[in-house]
Amino acid sequence: MEHVLGFVALAAGLIIGLGAIGACIGIGIMGSKYLESAARQPELMNELQTKMFLLAGLIDAAFLIGVGIAMMFAFANPFVLK
């Protein structure tokens, strides 16, 4: 029983930590590519900015879904039999 709770805490930490790292890297790469393309074609900056913010929201949504799953594992643990 204690091993299951320990592994669930470890898994929740990994889900949140690695998800945050992945989201930060993804948004950083996307932002750099946006700046490159805006410098290359300034007339498309408004259209590209709209798409960039939409994709940033989707990247953050994937991270927040992972946080929700980790919180479900931590507080409403489905792996512990009652």
From Swiss-Prot:
The main place the protein resides is membrane
TM region(s), chain numbering: 7-27, 53-73
Quote the subcellular location field of this record.
Cell inner membrane
Under the GO molecular function aspect, what terms does this record hold?
lipid binding; proton-transporting ATP synthase activity, rotational mechanism
Cellular component per GO, a single term: proton-transporting two-sector ATPase complex, proton-transporting domain
Which residues are tagged with the site Reversibly protonated during proton transport? Answer: 60
Going by the UniProt record, its keywords in alphabetical order are:
ATP synthesis, Cell inner membrane, Cell membrane, CF(0), Hydrogen ion transport, Ion transport, Lipid-binding, Membrane, Transmembrane, Transmembrane helix, Transport
For this protein, the record's NCBIfam families field holds: ATP_synt_c, PRK06876.1
Task: Describe its function.
Answer: F(1)F(0) ATP synthase produces ATP from ADP in the presence of a proton or sodium gradient. F-type ATPases consist of two structural domains, F(1) containing the extramembraneous catalytic core and F(0) containing the membrane proton channel, linked together by a central stalk and a peripheral stalk. During catalysis, ATP synthesis in the catalytic domain of F(1) is coupled via a rotary mechanism of the central stalk subunits to proton translocation. Key component of the F(0) channel; it plays a direct role in translocation across the membrane. A homomeric c-ring of between 10-14 subunits forms the central stalk rotor element with the F(1) delta and epsilon subunits.
Instruction: Tell me how this protein assembles.
Output: F-type ATPases have 2 components, F(1) - the catalytic core - and F(0) - the membrane proton channel. F(1) has five subunits: alpha(3), beta(3), gamma(1), delta(1), epsilon(1). F(0) has four main subunits: a(1), b(1), b'(1) and c(10-14). The alpha and beta chains form an alternating ring which encloses part of the gamma chain. F(1) is attached to F(0) by a central stalk formed by the gamma and epsilon chains, while a peripheral stalk is formed by the delta, b and b' chains.
Q: Know the name of this protein?
A: ATP synthase subunit c
Gene encoding this chain? atpE
